[in-house]
Curated annotation (Swiss-Prot):
Gene3D superfamilies: 1.10.10.350, HUPs (3.40.50.620). This is Glutamate--tRNA ligase. It comes from Bacillus subtilis (strain 168). The lineage of its organism: Bacteria, Bacillati, Bacillota, Bacilli, Bacillales. One of its GO terms (biological process) is glutamyl-tRNA aminoacylation. Monomer. Belongs to the class-I aminoacyl-tRNA synthetase family. Glutamate--tRNA ligase type 1 subfamily. Pfam families: Anticodon_2 (PF19269), tRNA-synt_1c (PF00749).
């Protein structure tokens, strides 16, 4: 094995890019770039029943959108291809035939029914289900009998007895398995397709992978892959198994959990920024030295240390993601924020697709009001709802404000001041509020809060004069008089 670090992300084209898979890709990418090595994408598409049309391209597109690039893959080629497992069957055949020849693998003619019966009997005896090995040493005559019955064989790896398979995991430390607890496992299915563990071991060796960084759900696969390496006398790559991502209930993130958005495509559609997602995912199970939490891609590459991968589960905190994204939104100029948010207002039917110069100016002012507090693009629809509705609803907090004794005087006086305005500008609106203060003697919260609640329906919000300007003179006066 050479000195150059070579790592891979190996997606199956069975669906869209999940946040967990994006993290696996990102950590491998950062490790390769930090070490001046190579990052490879290999498509594991042998499970044809689960593959979906466009799944492969979708994975690649959203990795690119996040800001991840690669050195070798189906789209850019490379000297260790093909990079789709479905195109490597002739390669796998050479290696499983070698194992058969050496007696390190054998043909198994057991039917699914026989295997199921064996499993049930083992469970009934309180044993861990595993293949008994009853076809380990079939005679030629026995094999011919099964063939005559029309049985098709799978090929099983002959697991050595009484061995300890140990490896030093980058994240977890020393891990070991007893070979007697594993059982002879299938390396080629009855239809001639290699199984995951066999194909992965062959590919990782031939593509010269030095490290294999993946989720901890792969730990149980590792001893099988190591035994395949050992059977061929190959150097074994260094393994690192990243901890699970958990939700706020500390349960493993499940694709069925609808309380958390889990696919990169959905975040893009909602108007999250790729740089912010890159930053957030980069801290899911990895921590830098110090307290800083915001890093550019270049900074991540510089500081990434694979030995700082967390040993405890990574908490997916939606509030934290919104905070991180907000920090990036704040850095955008107004044109960029308009580009991020306007399509969401249009999709929601709040504004038209063809805007006059006057309408464009109004929308820009509206979006500018919420620039600092905006967490993601689509949030603009919810934040600005009060500007697009005839009837505003008041929550309990707002109702409590409107029940204070000074409210009728403040609101009626302010309505009269607004009616007098010829130019409805923030400066003139601000002057009108000051005039109400002077005339009624009410100031501070007693003055501002009833006006804000009456006109916006909210107890908190952006600059009041600017908000009232955008609501419009007629609507603002109507809302004041409706209380």
């Amino acid at each position: 094995m050479g000195n150059e670090v070579r790592v891979r992300y190996a997606p199956s084209p069975t669906g869209h890019l999940h946040i967990g898979n994006a993290r696996t890709a990102l950590f491998n990418y950062l490790f390769a770039r930090n070490q001046g090595g190579k990052f490879i994408i290999r498509v594991e598409d042998t499970d044809k029943k689960r593959n979906i049309e466009g799944g492969e391209q979708s994975q690649l597109n959203y990795l690119k959108w996040l800001g991840i690039d690669w050195d070798e893959s189906v789209d850019v080629g490379g000297e260790y291809g093909p990079y789709r497992q479905s195109e490597r069957n002739d390669i796998y055949k050479v290696y499983y035939e070698e194992l058969l020849e050496k007696g390190l693998a054998y043909k198994c003619y057991c039917t699914e029914e026989e295997l199921e019966k064996e499993r049930e009997e083992q469970i009934a005896r309180g044993e861990m289900p595993r293949y008994s090995g009853k076809h380990r040493d079939l005679t030629q005559e026995e094999q011919e009998k099964f063939i005559a019955e029309g049985r098709k064989p799978s090929i099983r790896f002959r697991v050595p007895e009484g061995k300890v398979i140990a490896f030093n995991d980058i994240v977890k430390g020393e891990i070991s398995f007893e070979s007697d607890g594993i059982g002879d496992f299938v390396i080629v299915k009855k239809d001639g397709t290699p199984t995951y563990n066999f194909a992965v071991a062959i590919d990782d060796y031939l593509m010269k992978m030095t490290h294999v960084l993946r989720g901890e759900d792969h730990i149980s696969n590792t001893p099988k892959q190591i035994m395949i390496y050992q059977a061929f006398g190959w150097d074994i790559p260094q393994f690192g198994h990243m901890t699970l991502i958990v939700n706020e209930s500390r349960k493993k993130l499940s694709k069925r959990d609808e309380s958390i958005i889990q696919f990169i495509e959905q975040y893009k559609e909602l108007g999250y920024l790729p740089e912010a997602l890159f930053n957030f995912i980069g801290l899911l199970g990895w921590s830098p030295v110090g307290e800083e939490e915001l890093f550019t891609k270049e900074q991540f590459i510089e500081i990434f240390d694979v030995n700082r991968l967390s040993k405890s589960p990574a908490l997916f905190d939606m509030h934290k993601l919104k905070w991180v994204n907000n920090q990036y939104v704040k850095k955008l100029d107004l044109d960029q924020v308009v580009e991020l948010t306007l399509p969401h207002l249009q999709k929601a039917g709040k504004v038209g697709t063809e805007l006059s110069a006057e309408e464009q100016e109004w929308v820009r002012k509206l979006i500018s009001l919420y620039h600092e507090q905006l967490s993601y693009g689509a949030e603009i629809v919810e934040l600005t709802d009060l500007f697009f509705t005839d009837e505003i609803e008041y929550n309990q907090e707002a109702k409590a404000v409107l029940e204070e004794e000074q409210v009728p005087e403040v609101l009626s006086t302010f309505a009269a001041k607004l009616e007098e305005l010829e130019e409805f500008t923030p400066d003139n609106i601000k002057a009108s509020i000051k005039a109400v203060q002077k005339e009624t003697g009410h100031k501070g919260k007693k003055l501002f809060m009833p006006i804000r609640v009456a006109v916006t329906g909210q107890t908190h919000g952006p600059e009041l004069p600017q908000s009232i300007e955008l609501i419009g003179k007629e609507t603002a006066i109507q809302r004041l008089k409706n209380i």
